[in-house]
Design a protein with these regions (language model features):
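Short, surface-exposed loop/turn segments at secondary-structure junctions
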Residues: 65-72
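Metalloprotease/metallohydrolase-associated module, dominated by Zn2+-dependent proteases
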Residues: 17, 21, 30, 35-42, ...
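Catalytic glutamate of the conserved HExxH
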Residues: 157-173
Length: 206
């Protein structure tokens, strides 16, 4: 797979670099305490962890985290959410936070109403139960119970917060097609690597 550079992706940095006052740094002791509960962070290098801490500070400064349906979140839990959501940004920087402003958190899986029109023109309406959702130019939505399940078993291979943030990165260029904003020179290599990995995945599950 094509590897993103350790530093910010140049295109994102140039397109989405915001001339804003830096957010206040996170309390070092609070970060250390939070880190103990997020084993995914234990594998990070010191450099990557420092970058993640800075990104998490930006996340908490710029995003409104709204618990719903009677859920209450303390500062440590909000920091957990910020850290998980910012893990996919380690290769692209704070520009990956652009385009949305609110994280909604339900206590557990939530239901949404769906509809679609089939080939015969018949409208079908139904309820769908979700553990996370990312709206184009809208909020990111998570189930707190499933975030906690991911923290309890972090190497299972799925993390709903990371998954939904990947959709936010995908949408940065205006097209939800599995490809985040990339320098033109990387686009062909990205497509080839993505197709190769997808084909390998299909072989495993077929």
């Amino acid at each position: 797979m094509a590897q993103l550079p350790a530093r910010h992706v140049p295109l994102i940095g140039s397109l989405f670099g915001w001339l804003k006052r830096p957010p206040p740094s996170l309390d070092a002791l609070a970060w250390r305490d939070m880190r103990r509960s997020v084993r995914l962070l234990h594998t990070l290098s010191a450099e990557d962890e420092a970058r993640l801490q800075s990104l998490s500070a930006a996340f908490l400064h710029e995003k409104t985290i709204t618990p719903l349906a009677g859920l209450a979140l303390d500062d440590a839990q909000r920091m957990q959410l910020a850290a998980l959501c910012c893990l996919p940004l380690l290769g692209c920087g704070a520009g990956g936070l652009r385009g949305w402003s609110q994280l909604l958190v339900y206590p557990e899986a939530f239901r949404v109403q769906r509809s679609h029109v089939d080939a015969a023109g018949v409208l079908h309406e139904y309820d769908d139960e979700l553990i996370g959702e990312s709206w184009d130019a809208g909020p990111l939505i998570l189930s707190w119970a499933d975030v906690q399940a991911d923290l309890a078993d972090p190497f299972e291979g799925y993390c709903v917060a990371i998954h939904e943030m990947a959709h936010k990165l995908d949408a940065l260029d205006g097209a939800i097609d599995g490809t985040p904003p990339l320098p033109r020179a990387w686009q062909r290599e990205w497509a080839a690597d993505f197709q190769s990995q997808y084909d390998a995945f299909c072989e495993q599950v077929d």
